[in-house]
A protein has these predicted regions:
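Glycine-rich phosphate-binding active-site loops on the catalytic face of alpha/beta enzymes
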Residues: 36-49, 85-107
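Alpha-helix-loop-beta-strand connector modules within alpha/beta enzyme cores
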Residues: 1-16, 50-75, 106-126
Length: 126
């Protein structure tokens, strides 16, 4: 409670430590009572796609009293699963393995990534 109060006027996000609680609905109820703004969760699995069923339950239980932000292993192959959950926010690095340690190979690559993120943002806002 004290951390949440100290964080004001900033929003407070409770991170994936939540994924270790034994009774997730009870834990979510506590976060709502504490007035946390957001919960980052993988649905108590290694990746959010594996925990999507619990994430759906958390979204339904929250009834917009707290933002549920799926995170862990979300990428271009599974992001639509989460966009279709009607969440406001998704956490992800959207990284890919590279053959070399170099940064990006060209400005075009940066612009393509930026366009992808802009398109995803537009879909999330719909």
């Amino acid at each position: 409670r004290e951390l949440i109060e100290l964080s004001k006027p900033l929003e407070f996000t409770f991170h994936r430590a939540f994924d270790e609680v034994l009774k997730p609905i009870d834990g979510l109820r506590q976060l709502i009572e504490l007035k946390a703004n957001r919960l980052l969760t993988s649905g108590q699995k290694n990746t959010a796609i594996k925990g999507i069923n619990l994430i759906k339950k958390l979204i339904n239980f929250s009834n917009n009293r707290i933002k549920i932000m799926p995170g862990s292993g979300i990428n271009s192959t599974n992001i639509l699963e989460f966009i279709n959950l009607d969440v406001d926010e998704i956490h992800g690095s959207f990284s890919k393995d590279r053959k070399s340690k170099q940064s990006v190979s060209s400005i075009d690559e940066i612009l393509r990534c930026n366009n992808l993120m802009t398109d995803l943002h537009k879909k999330l806002k719909k």
